[in-house]
Amino acid sequence: IFYISLAYVTLKKFRLRLPEYISLLAICAFIYFVTDTKVDTLLILLLIVVSAFYNMVMKLLYRIGANTITLVAGAVVGIEIVLTYLYTANSRIFNIMDHILSGRLKYGHMAFKDYNVTMFGQFIKEYANGGIHKEKFNYFFIDVSYLRVLMFGGIVAFVALVIMLIYLVNKFIHDKTICLLLALLFAALSSLIDQHLMELSYNIIFIAMLTNNDYFKDKLV
């Protein structure tokens, strides 16, 4: 639901009307009370706030610049990967962080321990909660998108992803399409806890590398 909301808000260039704000708030309430998906609820609330103050956010991002944006985003991703690698069940601090992240540090660390990183990727057998399980199984799934690319695709694929993200940030700043930059940043933020970054059925922002994006150009700079 978050990615559908993000796609809609991006198509509207983060300029929403009152009925659209009310609809997004209703979606938040549904997600929180029916599915108990706290992260998506927070992301959609943030989407609403950014839309409400879009002009301020746009000017702020232009002022910050592409280099600072990529540096901060890269640092956050790097910290998460390092914490996952260093995770230990004997640490109270790590356990608190892992609880907040719904076990993502634990299962990510298991991936490092059992498979580690290769140059060109590898097959990793996962056991998720989807489908019908007739027998007991040991749950194991890598949720974090960046870690999935690193483990499944290898160092080469991960470096290619980093280059692509840096290119897109610079492209969106240069082309004055901040709404696309915001969509990328929201997808990147969500990918710290979900596996959908490289799935075009969820995250459509990578298509912007190959399209004419004049529709999304900012009128105020």
Region spans (language model):
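Hydrophobic transmembrane helix bundles of membrane-integrated enzymes that assemble
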Residues: 1-93, 110-116, 134-220
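Extracytoplasmic catalytic/substrate-binding loops of multi-pass membrane glycan-assembly enzymes
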Residues: 96-109, 119-128, 137-146
